[in-house]
Swiss-Prot record:
EC category: oxidoreductase
Enzymatic reactions: 6-phospho-D-gluconate + NADP(+) = D-ribulose 5-phosphate + CO2 + NADPH
Pathway membership: Carbohydrate degradation; pentose phosphate pathway; D-ribulose 5-phosphate from D-glucose 6-phosphate (oxidative stage): step 3/3
Keywords, in A-Z order: Gluconate utilization, NADP, Oxidoreductase, Pentose shunt
GO molecular function: NADP binding; phosphogluconate dehydrogenase (decarboxylating) activity
GO biological process: D-gluconate metabolic process; pentose-phosphate shunt
Sequence positions that bind NADP(+): G12, L13, A14, V15, M16, G17, N35, R36, T37, V77, K78, A79, N105
Protein name: 6-phosphogluconate dehydrogenase, decarboxylating
Species: Cunninghamella elegans
Database matches in SMART domains: 6PGD
Amino acid sequence: MVEAVADIGLIGLAVMGQNLILNMNDHGFVVCAYNRTTSKVDDFLANEAKGTNVVGAHSVEELCAKLKRPRKVMLLVKAGSAVDAFIDQLLPHLEEGDIIIDGGNSHFPDSIRRTKELEAKGILFVGSGVSGGEEGARYGPSLMPGGNSKAWEHIQPIFQAIAAKAPDGASCCEWVGETGAGHYVKMVHNGIEYGDMQLITEVYQILHEGLGLSHDEMADIFEEWNKGDLDSFLIEITRDILRFKDTDGQPLVTKIRDTAGQKGTGKWTAIDSLDRGIPVTLIGEAVYSRCLSSLKDERVRASKILQGPSSSKFTGDKKTFIAQLGQALYAAKIVSYAQGYMLMRQAAKDYEWKLNNAGIALMWRGGCIIRSVFLGKIRDAYTKNPELENLLFDDFFKDATAKAQDAWRNVTAQAVLMGIPTPALSTALNFYDGLRHEILPANLLQAQRDYFGAHTYELLHTPGKWVHTNWTGRGGNVSASTYDA
């Protein structure tokens, strides 16, 4: 009879899986490793895991037999059908109360489905976002578990031990919420990551193309910013990238083809925001900017055909403008996170999740790509008011955007005058202005829809009552009501 010695099993021995196993081992947990290609198990035990307490299994049945009850199995395999296939293989060897954890990059609807399907079979399912890449997996990732809450007490000691630690020592892992909440929050995290990166690249282009600064000069600016409110992993690595020289002494970044790739998680966030009717405009623009960058050949042709401003030279005080750039970047970053939290708030309503908003900010403070000092302020805002309607309504963020407002407007205006694209900086400001307007021109839009399609409209003094006007004789005839604008 096989002895149950392992605290947790892990399926999937790519680098992420191996590193998570070694991380768990470092924290005193016995892990049983399994891979579909069983030779990988032997190679791992003979090399990376040599001298550790890691044990191996050559079948799913052996894996489950080596696990202490309640059994805990973590999957780090390709999202999609592979996850379902392994779940099907595991089920005959599990019993009521056992736990399956999907730590891959699954889309949240799949996690919702799996939680419900497995609950009906007595199995506790957890869909957990894992952020931080290979190094994070080895030395401390940001973990975002959600699903069947009964599983949390059993996996909490492992997850909070192996997770990254924030500067104050807090573990970057908390229970997120029900069903697909863990993978949903990870999706929004990735969308915000898209937004943060796009904002930084726009500032980079303004500094380089607009102000004519060298890469070393720009690196100095990012280094200075990293000592203040903008202190973050992405600002830090941007500094390092700008300083990095190729073998010929030239900045390597200038030789990299300007076509950005994407794996689709930013697109997931943008599409989800459209489905929910939440204006997550900054992340959307970040996705579209990557799409535009991929049209390299067309942009090369356009650069020789399309006319820009008559004069694109900056004539102001550079030192003052650089300080304003930092303020604009900070304000736009606030909007990006406000939009992300708006989206999570709506999803929580739609799925009846009780999201741990302060805990989410805490989870993102270490071990992940968007980690920053800034997140501590978000945690404070939601700790003070767990039902906060909008991050911009918190006193700290309300004052911060107000303080940055003049600089923010000047930066976007100067970029327009210089012909430098700033889709993320600009859309953040446009969102801010739209949100603070009690009256928007959608009244005219509704009248147009009613004119050509009889879609009806509400009056200000009678909301909820829908009326239609026959506009004939006051600008034209009513068209057929088959239009859907």
